[in-house]
A protein has these predicted regions:
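N-terminal secretory signal peptides
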Residues: 1-32
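Detector for C-terminal structural segments
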Residues: 22-30, 286, 387-415, 456-467, ...
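Ligand/substrate-recognition segments at binding pockets and active sites
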Residues: 35-37, 63, 111, 287, ...
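Structural transition elements
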Residues: 93, 375, 403-436, 454-460
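N-terminal lobe/hinge region of extracytoplasmic solute-binding protein
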Residues: 110-159, 190, 273-276
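A structural "hinge/loop" feature
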Residues: 112-131, 151, 178, 240, ...
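Gly/Pro-rich hinge or "lid" segments in bacterial periplasmic/extracellular proteins
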Residues: 141-142, 146, 219-220, 231, ...
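Ligand-site clamp/hinge motif
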Residues: 268-271, 297-345
């Protein structure tokens, strides 16, 4: 997930590696967090438990994704298991939740976000509120972090996990009553690679057959996805992909309504036109002001208790600060607390009792142009990575709201490698700058600039780095902020144009290193266009992505991580974590480590 202006969840420092699926081997896992935390509120299914409303209980730290091949002997209640044929079926996963007692008469959930740059699942690099109205073949149950069937009731892989076949749930409908079939999913997934759609996230389809040929001009119709009939969808992959169910759960693989797109063109996403497949329909979209959602009468699953979801839209540079004020004024029911407001909230007698921590799987980084002077010199890039006080950044500037990130992969992702970190600190940085021809900053370009999406916390961090580099290395660095959409456009435009530095964040879309190393940093993808290329790195991650031995695969990604960090085209700064205020009578609010930024109405409810 492109974390430009997205809220990231808490990254705990316990070095817990989460397993991932391997064809014919162990079950995959979806990274929930790097350690353990508490789930602050209950869901309807859990509301009948003995603990009082509003208390906390342990949240899962890691959970099994349904196996591609082989079978687990047991599974948690409500989870999905595989049979000996490799088939995954719905089982009890779609049972209606127990209706909680003492429900409030009014069930309207209010929160806030920024104006999404796009609401098209095949275009955007972050889901925003899309999961309120769209759903995929499989989904992640936020109450237990299990991958569960959604529009598909079952799926199976062939012997080497290169072909995945999904069976559709019978009787599916779009919110307007139009039948929803496997052909809708085929159409939608092919949109990811269609140049006319102009996706900012084409790497989501990289594993599908012919994706590379399509990037070179072949027809999107040749992509490795096909509706064998209305009830059967088949994906053909370029290599063994044991983690494919994780990919299929992401927003890029949501079905979108071809009949509406054909009718309305670019206006299909407006509230008056859009139809949906998820638990809600969009009733209003007052741009830069409000998105409102109400229950979808044609949703296949249990109807939510929350009857209306209202997402107030705030300016992207100040929405956290304004959101806190809105929460205190009882204008929203939950709001994230920014790092700059964290101290005040913790010291407030009332607010501190309503503050809840959540796990995370993300990294905030600086990205350097590896072909443009002076950062074309690896010594300069390493010096910038070493030339500041990390402890002061985390403890003083960010007030321990975030955790230090000397390496790029978060601790919860297989391949995490503490030993990959650069060493030597400020003294080494000074020496490297001298070797690179910039002793005490002499000869440094006066217009060296870092671009970033406007955000108060990011601004604080960059101003600290700016001062540190001046003090320690004698160099001047300019800062240039842009609103979120413009920042994304700037990043994309750098594929063919030089730059100095870009601040950017990434949060895991699923708990696998492919979503980091292959997705972001492979020279053929380059999400951040640093123009850095390392043949050894590319070779390692290409080999590792389809390996079925999970331990050996993690070792390969650890090797890749060391190359990535030592080459320093990307400077990791800190791992994300988040704290949310939640009204005492609001239950069922979850923010998982992965894709957990926006609360989902389907789990929530209010008590009296």
């Amino acid at each position: 997930m492109d974390e430009t202006m997205r809220r990231t969840a808490r990254a705990y420092t316990r070095r817990k590696f989460l397993a991932f699926s391997a064809a014919g081997a162990a079950a995959a896992t979806l990274a929930a967090c790097g350690g353990s935390t508490n789930a602050p509120t209950e869901t309807p299914a859990a509301a009948a438990a003995t603990k009082p409303a509003g208390t906390t209980g342990p949240a899962p730290t890691a959970t099994n994704v349904p196996q591609s091949l082989g079978a687990a002997s047991t599974a948690p209640a409500g989870s999905v298991t595989t049979g000996t044929t490799g088939t995954v079926s719905a089982g009890s996963a779609v049972a209606a939740p127990t209706k909680p007692a003492n429900l409030a008469d009014k069930q309207v959930l209010r929160y806030l976000d920024i104006e999404p740059p796009t609401f098209d699942p095949q275009v955007g690099s972050s889901p925003y509120n899309m999961p309120q109205i769209f759903e995929g073949l499989v989904t992640v149950n936020w109450t237990n972090n299990q991958i569960e069937p959604a529009h598909a009731v079952s799926y199976e892989a062939n012997a080497d996990a290169t072909v995945w076949t999904f069976k559709m749930r019978p009787g599916l409908k779009w919110s307007d009553g139009t039948p929803l079939t496997a052909k809708d999913f085929e159409y939608s997934v092919k949109r990811i690679v269609d140049p006319k759609v102009a996706s900012k996230y084409t790497a989501a389809a990289e594993n599908l057959k012919n994706s590379a040929e399509i990037a070179k001009g072949a027809s999107p119709d040749t992509l490795g996805v096909k509706a064998l009939d209305d009830a059967t969808l088949q994906f053909t992959l370029t290599a063994p992909t044991p983690f494919f169910p994780l990919l299929a759960s992401t927003w890029s693989y949501y079905a979108v309504p071809k009949h509406v797109i054909d009718k309305f063109g670019d206006k299909w996403l407006e509230a008056a036109n859009i139809v949906s497949s998820g638990p809600y329909i969009m009733k209003e979209w007052k741009h830069d002001s409000l998105q409102a959602f109400e229950i979808n009468p044609n949703y296949w699953g249990p109807k939510p208790i929350i009857t209306r979801v209202e997402c107030s839209i705030f300016p992207d540079g100040t929405y956290l600060q304004q959101g806190l004020a809105a929460y205190e004024n009882n204008e929203v029911d939950t709001a994230q607390v920014s790092a700059s407001d964290y101290d005040r909230v913790v010291k407030d007698a009332k607010l501190s009792k309503e503050l809840k921590p959540f796990p995370g799987s993300s990294t905030f980084m600086l990205h350097w142009d590896a072909t443009n002077k002076p950062t074309s010199d690896v010594k300069v890039r390493q010096a910038l990575s070493l030339g500041f006080d990390r402890k002061a950044l985390i403890d003083v500037v960010l007030k321990k709201y975030y955790t230090d990130a000397p390496t790029i992969l978060p601790p919860d992702i297989p391949g995490y490698n503490e030993a990959a970190a650069l060493t030597g600190g400020v003294e080494k940085a000074k020496s490297l700058m001298t070797e690179a021809g910039f002793p005490n900053g002499q000869g440094w370009p006066a217009d060296f600039t870092i671009e970033y999406a406007s955000n108060a916390t990011i601004k604080l961090a960059l101003e600290f780095l700016q001062a540190e580099w001046k003090k320690n290395l004698g160099i001047d660095v300019k800062l240039d902020s842009r609103e979120s959409k413009a920042a994304v456009e700037y990043r994309v435009s750098r594929k063919t144009q030089p730059f100095n530095g870009i601040f950017g964040q990434w949060g895991s879309d699923y708990g696998d290193p492919f979503n980091w190393h292959n997705f972001l940093f492979a020279s053929k993808n380059e999400f951040w266009p640093t123009h850095w290329k390392n043949d050894e790195f590319d070779s390692i991650i290409e080999k590792a992505k389809g390996m079925t031995d999970k331990a050996a695969r993690a070792v390969e990604y650890q090797k890749a991580e060391k190359i990535l960090v030592q080459e320093a085209a990307h400077t990791p700064l800190y791992h994300g974590q988040s704290f949310f205020l939640i009204k005492p009578n609001l239950q069922g609010i979850y923010h998982p480590a992965i894709l957990g930024t926006v609360p989902r109405g389907k789990y929530a409810y209010f008590t009296k």
